Design a protein with these regions (language model features):
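Donor/substrate-binding cores of folate-linked one-carbon enzymes
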Residues: 2-132, 136-137, 141
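Carbohydrate-active catalytic/glycan-binding domains of CAZyme proteins
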Residues: 131-427
């Protein structure tokens, strides 16, 4: 940790001295970078771009990114995501400065928050602190007993109808009444979306083969307390998931996640529900969780972009005047660099005149929980949302993850993950 800049140099440049701080300054001031998150078991590691003041790590925060802490004892390994994710911060803010002026940067700066760190200033850990931390960690490694039964994380769907919707349940949501849907032997189901067709309700979902670890898209009719036998509707030589299914005009479309292919592809239904033709490659990028919202003649695309698998994921917003038209990036992009809400968790929906975007929290681990965020402002120039309801896996015994939500009318469907013996779910 270098010495603090003081005096006239801080105001020598018109817009001050910009500096990275590799931790969340609401909890960590000082250093070493992204070490104390590991030490304290914090699931979130941060990075920020600030305008320096004479107070250590207390300047105006122009931009902040929050990433999942990488478990273990390697500080350098834990630095990879924050370093990589923040690599574009300066360029993004310089672009905004050029296009919109300094007042815009001040207006969009992270609001000041009270410091909540356990230490006033963090410094290089002492030998005794390292011993207190590493001793138990190394002891657990030495005493670790091999697991007799191999375990897998098994995803399933759960459905309910007639109960108050999750979005109406307030800060302590009630998820009682959900019925679990068992997957076929050797497979797991996740990422459910629902859509009506005539007087029938259907769900489309990710259907993964344990043996190949490759997903396809399957669908089933939603019936009282369950679903019909699933039918595969879209299968490729690469992994498919997150089937964002929707209607535009008189046509039914789907945008499945195909991140391993590196494209965002649009499919049109030519025979509902089981025949789909490729309509167009909408976007070429390593994208996940693409979710569409159509409103007032505009097509909005929420897309989580990542340069490398699992590194530096950011939520970007694009618009187009036609479904297959050219995408225009929103001037506020990226609209989130927070690992707790920058990945889609289901269809955007309107309820009681309010617009909601489900997002998943990947802080503790991928797909840990989901939040329903109310979209307060959505136009060509501004985007703003606020969290309303968060569902964590504690809603059902044994769950370690729940990351997708969909509802049509009073019917709701979610997914959930629990560790189970591999033999119990594989062929």
């Amino acid at each position: 940790m270098g010495s603090i800049l003081r005096g006239e140099i801080l105001t020598a440049a018109k817009y001050g001295v910009w500096s990275y701080h590799h931790s969340d300054n609401q909890y960590y001031r000082g250093g070493p970078a992204n070490f104390w998150e590991l030490y304290e078991g914090n699931p979130i590691s941060g990075v920020m771009l600030q305008v320096l003041t004479e107070e250590l790590d207390a300047g105006k925060v122009l931009y902040k990114g929050l990433f999942a802490t990488r478990p273990g004892i390697s500080r350098m390994r834990n630095c990879v995501q924050p370093y990589w994710g923040a690599s574009t911060f300066v360029i993004q803010k310089l672009r905004e400065l050029h296009q919109h002026g300094w007042e815009h940067l001040e207006r969009t700066a992270v609001p000041p928050a009270a410091y909540l760190g356990k230490k006033k200033i963090y410094t290089v850990p002492s030998n005794s602190e390292m011993l207190r931390w590493l001793g138990p960690v190394l002891l657990r490694k030495v005493l670790r007993v091999p697991v007799c039964r191999p375990m897998v994380e098994h995803w399933r769907l759960a459905i309910r109808s007639g109960a108050p919707l999750v979005v109406d349940s307030g800060p302590t949501p009630d998820l009682s009444g959900f019925h679990w849907i068992e997957s076929m032997k050797g497979r797991f189901y996740a990422d459910p979306f629902m859509i009506e067709d005539g007087d029938k309700l259907w769900t489309f979902f990710e259907d993964v083969d344990y043996e190949t670890q490759r997903g396809r898209i399957s669908c089933a009719e939603v019936q009282k307390g369950g679903i019909s036998n699933p039918v595969p509707v879209l299968e490729m030589p690469y992994h498919l998931s997150y089937p964002c299914v929707f209607r535009a005009g008189n046509e039914t479309y789907m945008i499945p996640e195909s991140g391993s292919k590196g494209t965002v592809d649009l499919y049109r239904c030519v025979r509902f529900p089981d025949k789909w033709d490729m309509e167009k490659e909408l976007f070429r990028a390593p994208a996940v969780g693409t979710t569409i919202w159509i409103d007032d003649g505009l097509y909005w695309f929420f897309v989580s972009l990542e340069e490398l698998r699992g590194l530096g994921t950011q939520l970007w917003l694009f618009s187009a005047t036609t479904l297959t038209g050219e995408w225009t990036p929103h001037p506020g992009n990226p609209i989130s660099t927070d690992v707790r809400n920058n990945r889609g968790a289901g269809a955007v929906f309107r309820h009681d005149g309010k617009l909601f975007r489900p997002s998943q929290d990947c802080g503790k681990h991928e797909g840990y929980s989901f939040t329903l965020n109310q979209i307060v402002t959505l136009d060509r120039y501004q985007y703003q949302e606020k969290p309303c309801v968060t569902i964590n896996p504690l809603w059902a015994p044994g769950l370690v993850g729940t990351h997708t939500y969909s509802h049509v009318g009073q019917v709701e469907i979610v997914d959930g993950c629990e560790p189970v013996p591999a033999r119990s779910v594989r062929d």
